A protein has these predicted regions:
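C-terminal segment of N-terminal export signals and the immediately downstream linker at the start
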Residues: 25-43, 47-50
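Short active-site neighborhood of thiol/selenol oxidoreductases, capturing the structured segment around
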Residues: 62-80, 192
């Protein structure tokens, strides 16, 4: 009897450790370059990256505007959760409808998961009925490193004064289940609401969850 109970305890404990390990792998350790990356409460660093339309887009061009930066990888199951449920598109439309600039960035290196050409990125925007202001291609990962983007999705909010006021996860449900979108605390929406009303962001930093950004 004792042996049976001990075995059950071992299996249960082992299962818990496995589950915890799997959950932890969605965030992972921060790379060394994150130490010098953009920080909440400081001016958002300017950058310029090519859009899928072939024109360079710089953050500086949107002075006086609230800007959302969304790091994405269409093959990542965590990203798919938010697009297949329509959650990301709804948030994009809600934000841009209020004058917010929404820039979607793809930092996957050539040959890595999530890498797409400009035409493929535009096709994804169309088929998923996404509504960003622009999709930017960051093949060399320079913008991603500048902001310390480690996961997809990884979200940032810049206020009208150019300050970085939010960085982290899209919400508090680090799973791939579409059903978990409902009832989740959406940190990005909350940050945008605070900015719109002139209030400080209640939760300015969270730990992003998802697939690691596929840098070269």
């Amino acid at each position: 009897m004792r042996e049976t109970m001990s075995r059950r305890h071992f299996l249960t404990t082992t299962g818990i450790f496995i589950l915890v390990g799997q959950a932890a792998s969605t965030v992972g350790p921060s790379p060394s370059w994150c130490a010098t990356a953009a920080k909440v409460g400081e001016p958002a660093p300017d950058f310029t990256a090519p859009s899928t339309k072939g024109t360079p887009v710089g953050l500086d061009a949107y002075k006086g505007k609230v800007v959302v930066l969304e790091w994405t990888n269409h093959e990542c199951p965590y990203v798919r959760k938010h697009y297949e449920s329509g959650n990301m598109q709804a948030l994009q439309r809600e934000a841009t409808g209020q004058g917010v600039i929404w820039l979607t960035l793809i930092s996957s290196a050539k040959g890595e998961q999530g890498f797409v050409s400009a035409a493929q990125a535009d096709e994804l925007t169309t088929t998923r009925k996404a509504a960003p202001t622009a999709v930017l291609l960051d093949e060399k990962g320079s913008v991603g490193h500048l902001y310390g983007a480690t996961n997809t999705p990884h979200m940032y909010v810049v206020d009208k004064t150019g300050m970085l006021v939010y960085a982290g996860a899209i919400d508090d449900r680090p799973t791939t289940r579409r059903s978990d979108v409902q009832g989740a605390n959406n940190y990005v929406r909350a940050a945008l609401d605070s900015v719109a009303t002139g209030q400080p962001v209640k939760t300015p930093v969270t730990r992003a969850y998802g697939c690691t950004v596929k840098y070269s």
